[in-house]
Curated annotation (Swiss-Prot):
Entry cofactors: Mn(2+); Mg(2+)
Keyword Metal-binding annotated: yes
Reported function: Endonuclease that specifically degrades the RNA of RNA-DNA hybrids.
Organism this protein belongs to: Corynebacterium efficiens (strain DSM 44549 / YS-314 / AJ 12310 / JCM 11189 / NBRC 100395)
Localisation per UniProt entry: Cytoplasm
Protein's UniProt name: Ribonuclease HII
Family, similarity comment: Belongs to the RNase HII family.
């Protein structure tokens, strides 16, 4: 009974909009906005206008364990009327800024849907320039089913990208913190410098990379002096 009640609550926005002829309703959400390494991933998703038992545990992806998210992602794709995931690179975030990258990415994710939505729901962000009306819902990834589905797609896809990236850059521990600004991560940047996948426009990355560069420069000076002395 509790599961049925929750499914109905999550569908409230979509059902109300569809009844007013504004469907299909797409949800949009992002993952990685607060990270300092790797891309920001943005997903859009349209779900059928009916309860889906397979998605009964659907909620804000941050509240779900990694195994549950991994299990849910293929189910969301299976049941979705349409879905898309796009990625904005760290280089583009540095070039255009995180806010512009986020909004631009949300527009691109909606445009990439194979079915054109009649209405778009977002998790708190207003998206100008959409071809249809939209509504930002604070905490939407926990209260609107289509946003929760987009949240799972964005976060799980990005987590997989960061796990793969950890193979290329093992010195940063990316598989654990997924590019967020943990102490372990920032200490690694101070030791090794920032990688091409870091967001150099972020103050903490710039500071840690500068500390690495200064320490690296001091070491080179010391080594040069040692060689000259040995000569």
């Amino acid at each position: 009974m509790a599961t049925i009640r929750r499914l109905k609550q999550l569908r409230t926005y979509e059902v109300a909009l569809s009844r007013h002829g504004l469907g299909p309703v797409a949800g949009v959400d992002e993952a990685g906005r607060g990270a300092c390494c790797g891309p920001i991933s943005i997903a859009a998703c349209i779900l059928p206008d009916r309860p889906i038992a397979d998605l009964a545990v659907l909620t804000d992806s941050k509240q779900l364990s990694p195994p549950v998210r991994a299990r849910l992602m293929p189910l969301v794709k299976k049941h979705a009327v349409a879905w898309s995931v796009i990625h904005i690179s760290a280089a583009d975030i540095d070039r255009f800024g995180i806010q512009h990258a986020n909004i631009s990415g949300m527009r691109r994710a909606v445009a990439a849907l194979e079915v054109r939505p009649g209405y778009v729901l977002t998790d708190a962000f207003r998206i100008p320039g959409l071809p249809c009306p939209s509504l930002p819902i604070p905490g939407g990834d926990a209260s609107a089913r289509c946003i929760a589905a987009a949240s799972v797609l964005a976060k799980q896809t990005r987590d997989e990208i960061m796990t793969d990236m950890a193979q290329q850059f093992p010195q940063y521990g990316l598989a654990g913190h997924k590019g967020y600004s943990t102490k372990v991560h920032m200490d690694a940047v101070r030791r090794h410098g920032a990688s091409p996948q870091h967001r150099y426009s972020y103050a903490n990355v710039a500071k840690a990379h500068r500390e690495w560069a200064l320490s690296h420069s001091d070491t080179e000076v010391q080594n040069t002096g040692k060689v000259e002395h040995e000569r």
